[in-house]
Amino acid sequence: MAAGCRGPACPSWRLHISRELRRRDREQRQVFEELISQYKRLLEKSDLQSVLADKLQAEKYEQQSRHDSSPGPDGMRNDMLLQDMAQMRIKHQEELTELHKKRGELAQTVIELNNQMQQKDKEIQANEEKIAKYLQTIQDLETECQDLRNKLQELERANQTLKDEYDALQITFTALEDKLRKTTEDNQELVSRWMAEKAQEANRLNAENEKDSKRRQARLQKELAEAAKEPLSFEHDDDIEVLNDNADPVGDSAGAQATGRNISKRNSQPAVGGLLDSITNIFGLSESPSLSHRSDSSRRRSLNSFPASPDCADTPGAGNREVRVPATAVYSFDAHDGEVNAVRFSPGSRLLATGGMDRRVKLWDVIGNKCEAKGSLTGSNAGITSIEFDSAGSYLLAASNDFASRIWTVDDYRLRHTLTGHSGKVLSAKFLLDNARIVSGSHDRTLKLWDLRSKVCIKTVFAGSSCNDIVCTEQCVMSGHFDKKIRFWDIRTECIVRELELQGRITALDLNPERTQLLSCSRDDLIKITDLRANAVQQTFSAPGFKCGSDWTRVIFSPDGSYVSAGSAEGTLYFWNVLTGKVERMFSKQHSSSINAVAWSPSGTHVVSVDKGSRGVLWSDF
């Protein structure tokens, strides 16, 4: 077997088994070789004793036979033979006893050796099993080693590949870094050019607005001059005497002369506002309604052309007027080319602003029970989402889907500021009470505080959720979010003062005139009033048909805080009584699509609602 396995094709495990068997044969043969040889000698002695015993037995029989056949005189000799035989028998008996004793000892030794051999055989069998197990383990380990060698080779190849890829990526990174640096430089150059072009475009828009303003003023002066040339008949009454408050009442003729001087002096003045006031007072009792209408319209245009916004003084005593729920729709108009998202009255109630998906803010004069288009504010690159006037009505702030907020002056339609910095669409922007700062909330889950003096963002607060609407007090900003929470922020510390969680996504917020109650609308189709002093929900409004149409559906308090108004998804306008919590009135025929926003004039005389279908409706109780 060993000779057959010495060739180069013989497996290593066969050689190992052959060597182990030869080693075991040597070790066990040396241990038992002497014992086996002694056992053989004892067997030979036993056989010899048997032969001797047989021989002696034969001799005994022969002696007896001879003794029986021998004659009498030989008796002495027979006695001697008998004695010899007895002695030999005793001797042989002793030898036989000793042999039996040795045989017993040898048998015991053989038994013990057999036991040892059996034990050794068991040990050999156990060792063979261990050897087989070890051989199997060795084979498994060799297989595992081979697998590990293969894996090591694969890892080395992969490592080499990764090194090559790393070198290639490093080269690519260096090239991209150079490209990025070059692109950054190009971008800076493009931004500079873009800013210059934007400045030129703004200057062009401002120039066009300036031309429009000059044309309007020239047309107004021409109309006023024509109106002043027309012959008029009037009596000396209180209106004429108003122009002569500084003249001495010496008589009718002196008064008439003073009046003539006053009129000529006013006609010679270049100030359009003073001339307009004089003409309006003079023709207050005119019999020409068309002239009166032109004069009135001209007066409105002239007043709205000043930054001080005399629109605020158009409705004296409006705050003392009792607010009533509108009774009917008095005027319907197409506000924009597409969806209308926002609507707001100016502080004087005479000017209405609407914002839509056509990227424009449109201004409307509310004259009687009509809305007349006055102009539009351009510059936004996406749909308008929110509109806000400052407290004087001179500036208009609009948030847009192009990640920016913009400020225009109302009198000349000029774009004054563009506030960029959000990374998502801006859903709400509001003036703080000082009108020098602005807060904007965006879909990027941040709120930003802007300083209009420095035209920069001075604070950014991460709210953690998309902001849908904002309202402000002196030192607190309240924001409504997509995660169903209303957060109260301290402007000075940028910290959340408290949170109020509702059952649906917040779509709109509004404050009552005393700023003690917070109105909120959510996507669970509930409108709630929260008492800011008690930090608890005070009143909940709902209706069987009311359903919030979108995440930016706006709700509003009435100017005196007695009523709440909101539009539904199916186009119904609702009015609730704050004290009773019940529906005061509802209108369902004017809108054919979801109402997005509602505005209540500060004078309390009009309400405007706008919807997704580009329609605006003017409501009144007259």
From Swiss-Prot:
Coiled coil regions in record: 93-230
Polar residues composition bias: residue spans: 259-270
Signal peptide bounds: none
NADP recorded as keyword: no
Residues covered by region (WIPI2-binding): 207-230
Membrane topology: Peripheral membrane protein
GO cellular component: phagophore assembly site membrane
CDD domains assigned: Atg16_CCD, WD40
Start-end of each WD repeat: 335-374, 379-418, 421-460, 462-499, 501-540, 547-588, 590-622
Location, primary (coarse class): cytoplasm
Chain residue ranges for the region called Disordered: 59-78, 244-271, 287-320
Biased composition (Basic and acidic residues): 59-69
Cell compartment(s), UniProt: Cytoplasm; Preautophagosomal structure membrane
Positions of region (FIP200-binding): 230-242
UniProt GO BP: autophagosome assembly; protein transport
Pfam families, A to Z: ATG16, WD40
Cited function: Plays an essential role in autophagy: interacts with ATG12-ATG5 to mediate the conjugation of phosphatidylethanolamine (PE) to LC3 (MAP1LC3A, MAP1LC3B or MAP1LC3C), to produce a membrane-bound activated form of LC3 named LC3-II. Thereby, controls the elongation of the nascent autophagosomal membrane.
Protein family per UniProt: Belongs to the WD repeat ATG16 family.
Quaternary state and interactors: Homooligomer. Part of either the minor and major complexes respectively composed of 4 sets of ATG12-ATG5 and ATG16L1 (400 kDa) or 8 sets of ATG12-ATG5 and ATG16L1 (800 kDa).
Protein known as: Autophagy-related protein 16
Organism per entry: Xenopus tropicalis (Western clawed frog)
